[in-house]
Amino acid sequence: MTGLFIIALGAGGIKPCVSAFMGDQIPNKSPQLMTKAFNAFYWAINLGSFFSFLVIPAMEQHYGYSWAFAVPGIFMGIATFVFWLGRKKYHRTPPERNNGRAGFWKVLFIVLFHGGWKNAEQRCGASAVEDARHILKILSIFVFIIPFWSIFEQTASSWVAQGSRMIPLSIPLPGGGDWSIGPAQIQAANPIFVMVFIPLITVFVYPKVVTLARPLVRLGTGLALSSVTFLIVAFLQYRLEGGASMSIAWQLIPYCVLTISEILHSTTGLEFAYTQAPLHLKSVITSFWNLTIFAGNMLVAAITFFLSNGESANAISTDRFILYAILAAVVAVAYSFRARRYGKTE
């Protein structure tokens, strides 16, 4: 638990700041360059994820858990040192002093319990109220992202359970023998697809499909694709429940669609959080974006608990997958109406 707490503490500190820091390094902040930069940033994240799937299990198998945990720690130390070496070359945005301005939560508390926006402006100042309104406007978009993470995070749970009922994929090795790909190994398809699709989408799709140049459109398209993903998963589950014998390679189809949805969501969400936030609130807004991941996990946990009467064994079914597909579709439709009213504030 101590290790998990320290990891959570470190992740909570770096995640809201690293993407904002990366955005600060872009000189002219052009929309096209920002999109490419955040796509490259997310590509690098998945490169590390891919090697974790590839190297760490082998490290544990041959050298034990001690080295499996030590090697990532050593590389993190090296990365921190390399990052420190470039400290004099980075563009730094110094933190803005509070200067007596009330924070978001104080403004929100006054709005809800002590007389609304007018009273909040009198007690906290116009600039603090303007910041609070801006944050709430962005959060009105973020709230629609929560169901996506409820779907995406199931690749490590319900998809694994489904894959355990499928036939492992055997790939012949040059030196003899086979490499067996089971439900745990098939998850590596996600970072591989991300690294393949991000350059293709950035270079060929975005310049050709003009509507996808708008972040709000990309977010909505990603939501719709997540619904399609679970329709495919539901079909696979329907075949399995009917007694069909299926290779786990069939899961590559929903992984492919979900990865495209993820690219449209995650890279765009980080870009949207950075470009929409005021200068002094960029890390704060990004932290709210990361909070949608937590909320998505809590949502799927609640749905599983209530519909399964607390028994996770009932969580894998065709009906359950269809339920999530419908949820994503309904949210995508609702999001489309909110996105139209959001207005362009970039």
Spans of features found by a protein language model:
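Cytoplasmic membrane-interface "Motif A"-like loop-to-helix N-cap segments
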Residues: 206-224
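Transmembrane alpha-helical cores of Major Facilitator Superfamily
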Residues: 5, 39-47, 188, 192, ...
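Loop-to-transmembrane helix entry/capping segments in MFS-fold secondary transporters
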Residues: 29-41, 181, 277-288
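Intracellular juxtamembrane helix-capping segments at the cytosolic ends
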Residues: 11-29, 255, 259-277
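Central cavity-lining transmembrane alpha-helices of secondary-active solute carriers
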Residues: 47-52, 188-205, 295-298
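Intracellular loop-helix junctions on the cytosolic face of multi-pass helical membrane proteins
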Residues: 28-31, 35, 56-185, 196, ...
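Hydrophobic core of transmembrane alpha-helices in multi-pass small-molecule transporters
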Residues: 1-14, 229, 233-264
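A gly/Pro-rich, aromatic-decorated transmembrane alpha-helix motif that marks the paired
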Residues: 46-62, 231-235, 294-309
